[in-house]
Amino acid sequence: MAIPIAQWVADARANLAHAEQVCNDANMYLTSTSEKLRRREMKVPKLIYYLDALKQQLRLLEIIRDSLVLNLNGVMEKRAALQSQLLKDVDRLHQTIDTLKNTVVVFDGQTTLYEYISESGVEELFNGVSQNLKDIQTLIKGNRTDALLIRLTSDLDHLSNELNALDSKFRDMRLVDTQSSSIDPISKLLEINAELEHDMVAILTSFNNHYDQCEKGEAILKDPAVPQDEKDELVSVLQNDVEELPEAQRSLTSNAEIIKKNCKEVMKILDIFEDYFQRVETYVCELQEYGESKLRVQLKEFSDINTEVSRKLEIAQTHQDELVQYNSDFQQFVRSYYSLILELDRRMRVNEHISSAIDNFRSTISNIVEKDHEKRMEFLQKHGDFIPQNLVDSSVINSGTPQISINFDQEPLPAISKEVVQLAKKMQK
């Protein structure tokens, strides 16, 4: 029986070439997967940095938002408190003005205290208060501070939800060293591929050895110096190898297909990572664009509103101070008016006291003068004829009673009724 050694050599060469091609194809998948995995491992630290930095940026934005809310609430609370106080002070000043209008000046009985104040200044203040409060209300409504705050909060909520989704996906991908690698699908697939690759190397080595043995066998069979029994043993070995070739080829192909399938699965997972990484980078750009454009505009709007409202509130505070001052001055005017009445009444009573005292003094003096006159007459009657004229100056002997003149010019004061005086006393309490 002829030994088909030449056919075995040809088949061995063909099988080796096919096995090499199968291994090369599988190796291409392994190399491509390894390269893509290497790129992923290089991106993981950057990804972790991105996520940490993004979380910090969002926390900073939330702090800015909360600060704006506090600032805006503070301005709005100040505005509400100041507006309430202004309205109270306006009402008080109106009441004081009504008092001025209802207080008739007793000195002429026609004019009121209101006619002695600067009406234009008061009206200008009232108009200023009213207009400034309207301006503040228009400013707040026109710029829709609530809407601005809602938009800012909505934007931050949207960004926060996106980042939370990205962070959750990151945890699901199990990329951190501290996480268990035993349940990492890529690690499991790569472990399987390593075992299959080891088997394929062994199979490819067997194909290569078989080819070498076939070539050597062909030479041995042609060599007459080799004993026949050795040739028969060699043929038996080669025959067994030839019979095992199809199964080895099937195992090699099967392993290669499994490796390709596993690599495709790994690539799919890596593609998911690449897509995720791209989403994170897109989010970074989105957050950066938001900060440089939309947030900048929103912050400027808040700043403009805050600045303008604060300026208007300063004006309102000035108005409030002026209202208090006007009210204080006008109330003091009323008190001073009634104090004037009491002062005039006091002076009138002083005049009366002085007049009464002078009348009493005149009566006393009159009695003294009258008694003095009687004494003089009595003296002259008894002694006048016996005193020489040159004993003392005759004018002394014959002088008359001293004359005393008392004049009192009363202070001209307007007449004030007792009812008005009583009212003045009541108003001073």
From Swiss-Prot:
One of its GO terms (biological process) is autophagy of mitochondrion. One of its GO terms (molecular function) is protein kinase activator activity. The keyword Cytoplasm applies. Residues 146-175 form a coiled coil. The keyword Coiled coil applies. Keywords: Autophagy, Coiled coil, Cytoplasm, Membrane. Transmembrane segments: none annotated. Autophagy-specific protein that functions in response to autophagy-inducing signals as a scaffold to recruit other ATG proteins to organize pre-autophagosomal structure (PAS) formation. Modulates the timing and magnitude of the autophagy response, such as the size of the sequestering vesicles. Plays particularly a role in pexophagy and nucleophagy. This is Autophagy-related protein 17. It comes from Pichia angusta (Yeast). The lineage of its organism: Eukaryota, Fungi, Dikarya, Ascomycota, Saccharomycotina. The gene is ATG17.
